[in-house]
């Protein structure tokens, strides 16, 4: 509740502002200012200029004219590339493992590797990540190992999810990466709330919420951006616009200039970036983080990309797009190939080193897969853990009943 004195001060301030606006022919309605005009004209957003797409690196691995190389240095750039190879190799092998019936479900990140690693490299480990399901690269960059990924996908007793989560619902408390949820867009308002808490606690960190353009069609997207804007939350909303929401292309999802334009409607600074250019993604994220902490305001980045893989192992994308289209994007705009060309031209990578790196990652992924497969499932009694500090009586009864039924079944 506001005190009478506070309400009186607000009323006085509002009255004076309204009087000043009227004297200068401005409409000072609550919450906004705009000029009065005599014309009665509809504004058509199709007449406005499109938001440009920023890039630093072209498809050939060259710095584009007028752009400035952020000069990340050899170590960071080669680390980004090696992580791209690791994720791509893991995707290949884990996808095949699902087809062989060894794991139940999987989702790849083909074509979106630069988004994950370019942005992750510009964040701090203290920044809290609220991801969707296409950002395992962010978690990998933070230190989640191949064995961690494999254990989670097999749902074994070593996995952080203890066999209770879907395979690709990764998470890590120690790495500040919130566990993924199946429902789309739930992470967006959660991230806004976390960012608001950081602000109240005066912590020097931000929240980062990744999502696809399909998730931006959910109501949670709008609620989250409105909350983040009105509360001036230190949060980066990072949209991966990869062209498809499962089988629905963007042309059937929305009208208007993509997702970035929606940020303007909520008073949020925006940037659109080439999501296949790891340097541009890095620099956009770095600048966004710096702005967010300095201005205490949210930022929305839209990274344009193309989903080269199927939505998941439950999908066959050739039913709604041509194989030739996928092949074209793979051959002309692949982010891994672009990064490789840049490194070779800088003298930081050779073809021989690249082959050795790929062979080494394949060996490591296969070893992690085999080790995870050899580990047994979680014990039955773990189903009743991690909710209560001390098990209540009714759960103890149910646990006993479970073991009784299990014993009966195994006897027969």
Regions from the PLM with identified roles:
Residues 374-412:
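C-terminal intrinsically disordered, low-complexity extensions immediately downstream
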Residues 2, 6-7, 11-134, 375, ...:
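N-terminal amphipathic, basic-rich helices that act as targeting or association modules
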Residues 87, 125, 360-367, 389-393:
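A short structural micro-motif
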Residues 177-374:
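Glycine-rich ThDP/TPP pyrophosphate-binding loop and its adjacent helix/strand module
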Residues 93-97, 348-351, 373-382:
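Surface-exposed helix-capping loop/turn segments at secondary-structure junctions
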Residues 62-63, 136, 175, 242-245:
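A short, flexible beta-alpha/helix-coil linker loop
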């Amino acid at each position: 509740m506001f005190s009478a004195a506070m309400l009186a001060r607000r009323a006085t301030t509002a009255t004076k502002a309204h009087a000043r606006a009227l004297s200068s022919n401005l409409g000072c309605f609550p919450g906004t200012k705009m000029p009065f005009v005599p014309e009665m004209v509809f504004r058509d957003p199709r007449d406005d200029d499109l938001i440009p797409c920023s890039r630093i690196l072209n498809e050939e691995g060259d710095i584009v004219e007028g752009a400035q190389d952020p000069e990340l240095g050899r170590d960071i750039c080669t680390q980004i590339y090696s992580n791209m190879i690791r994720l791509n190799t893991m995707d290949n092998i884990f996808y095949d493992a699902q087809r062989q019936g060894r794991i139940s479900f999987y989702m790849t990140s083909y074509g979106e590797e630069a988004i994950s690693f370019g942005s992750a490299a510009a964040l701090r480990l203290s920044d809290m990540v609220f991801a969707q399901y296409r950002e395992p690269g962010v978690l990998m960059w933070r230190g989640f190992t191949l064995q961690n990924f494999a254990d989670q996908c097999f749902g074994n007793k070593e996995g952080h999810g203890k066999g209770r989560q879907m395979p690709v619902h990764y998470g890590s408390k120690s790495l500040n990466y919130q566990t993924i949820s199946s429902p789309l867009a739930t992470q967006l308002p959660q991230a806004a709330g976390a960012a608001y808490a950081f602000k109240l606690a005066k912590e020097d960190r931000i929240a980062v919420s990744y999502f696809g353009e399909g998730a931006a069609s959910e109501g949670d997207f709008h609620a989250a951006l409105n909350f983040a804007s009105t509360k001036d939350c230190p949060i980066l909303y990072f949209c991966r616009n990869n062209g498809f929401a499962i089988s629905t292309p963007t042309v059937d999802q929305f009208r208007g200039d993509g997702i970035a334009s929606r940020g303007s409607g909520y008073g949020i600074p925006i940037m659109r970036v080439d999501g296949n250019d790891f340097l541009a993604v890095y620099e956009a994220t770095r600048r966004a983080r710096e702005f967010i902490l300095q201005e205490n305001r949210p930022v929305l980045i839209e990274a344009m990309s193309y989903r080269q893989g199927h939505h998941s192992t439950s999908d066959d994308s050739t039913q709604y797009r041509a194989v030739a289209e996928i092949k074209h994007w793979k051959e002309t705009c692949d982010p891994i190939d672009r990064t490789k060309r840049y490194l070779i031209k800088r003298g930081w990578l050779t073809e021989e080193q690249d082959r050795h790196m790929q062979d080494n990652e394949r060996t490591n992924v296969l070893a992690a897969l085999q080790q995870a497969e050899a580990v047994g499932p979680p014990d039955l009694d773990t189903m009743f853990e991690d909710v209560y500090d001390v098990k209540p009586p009714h759960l103890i009864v149910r646990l006993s009943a479970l073991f009784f039924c299990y014993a009966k079944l195994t006897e027969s």
